[in-house]
Amino acid sequence: PGLMQRALALPGYYDGWGAYAAELAVLWQDRFDQAAALMRLYDAMAPGVLMRAICSIKVNYEGLERGELQEYLSMYGLGEDAHVDFFFDAAVNEPFAAFPQALGYAQLADLMRSLSADLGAAYREDEALAQYLSYGPAYGDLLRERMDVWADAQVDKG
């Protein structure tokens, strides 16, 4: 894993699980239309987590100024001054605030996709998540290694 994944491993474990659990709550509920509920969740998650992380990279790594960030955000319908002020101020004042959740969610979602592909019909998300949670908090590469061993044992069980 990269430096950022190692540096944010433990906060990413907690925050990533929180984001993934919110997604599961929507997927497993049956009170509301699932597609509509997912859209609302992703609409909230995209600007709240992912766009904050992206804007922080744009400002702090690429060196974008406020006007340049406004141009970038306009491509996503977020070019109004209030949005730009929010994202720019967050990037300057809290440059790493959104990274643990964004990276943690991405790592956990990737791990679950990999396990699903490896286990095929034997994949049970609830069992995989219970096993994942029993190992953590831990660094991503260690979690993946342990989950691979667990997946191999599931295949051996048949």
Predicted regions and their residues:
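Long, amphipathic alpha-helical stalk/connector segments used for oligomerization, subunit docking
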Residues: E23-N93
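C-terminal, non-catalytic "cap/extension" segments appended to globular domains
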Residues: G77-G158
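An active-site-proximal "capping" alpha-helix that borders the catalytic cofactor pocket
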Residues: P11-L27
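Short alpha-helical patches at coil-to-helix transitions and adjacent helical residues
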Residues: Y14-D15, A19, G48, R52, ...
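Generic structural signal for bulky hydrophobic/aromatic residues embedded
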Residues: A21-L24, K58, Q107, Q131
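Post-HEXXH active-site segment of zinc metalloproteases
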Residues: P1-Y14
